[in-house]
Amino acid sequence: MIYLAYIVIAFTAIQLMVALMNVVFKQRLPKSSAQEVLVSILIPARNEENTIEKLLKDLQQQDYQNIEVFVYNDQSSDNTANIVEQYVQKDARFHLINGSALPSDWLGKSRACHELAQHASGSYFLFLDADVRIKGAIIGRTVAMMVKNKLTLLSLFPKQEMQSWGERLTVPLMNYILLTLLPLVFVQKSWFTSHSAANGQ
């Protein structure tokens, strides 16, 4: 039994060290925005009538204006498509893609993201879930980080807004696993793609 305790203590100590490393070497986005390269905002959406309009408003209010926004309507049965269409009619940067039936060899969100990428023409692609909120100069600062560090992939850790007790119990586990088991400073230095991890929001 004592050996089991040693194993648990050792594993916990490793997690603590990884977490401390991630705090100490945490990178923040630059305060200033990058040059105005075209950024493609790609949003897969299925039955998102309660959230999609908030995100579209956020995008319109961004300081970074050189964007194109594609929303993939994945056969929604609610008012998602109509809401997006209102923005398409008013703003030439917004586009709606109505998805077809899912092929048997695809998963829903993966297929939606693939279809979105096929339509995009920006220098950078920013994938967002429909329930995400973005504020301030986040797009420009994100591009500045990628340009400065010559990155091909950048994943952000967003603030998680949790409403129910179920969300409060489960959602933090995602960041817990990443931040205590994955030393991000090594990920940034490693040439192995298998060491990469990204947030799926």
Identify the meaning behind each predicted range.
Residues 113, 125:
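Short aromatic/hydrophobic "clamp" motif used to bind/position activated sugar donors
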Residues 98, 102-112, 141, 145-201:
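Long helical/loop segments within the catalytic core of UDP-sugar-dependent glycosyltransferases
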Residues 37-40, 68:
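Cell-envelope/extracellular polymer assembly enzymes that use nucleotide-activated donors
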Residues 40-48, 55, 62, 72, ...:
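A conserved hydrophobic helix/loop-capping motif in glycosyltransferases and polysaccharide synthases
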Residues 79, 130-145:
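Acidic donor-binding/catalytic loop of UDP-sugar-dependent glycosyltransferases
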Residues 1-35, 172, 184:
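N-terminal membrane-anchoring/stem segments of glycan-assembly enzymes
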Residues 56-102:
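Acidic donor-binding segment of Leloir-type glycosyltransferases
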Residues 19-30, 48-61:
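Short, well-formed alpha-helical segments that are part of the catalytic scaffolds
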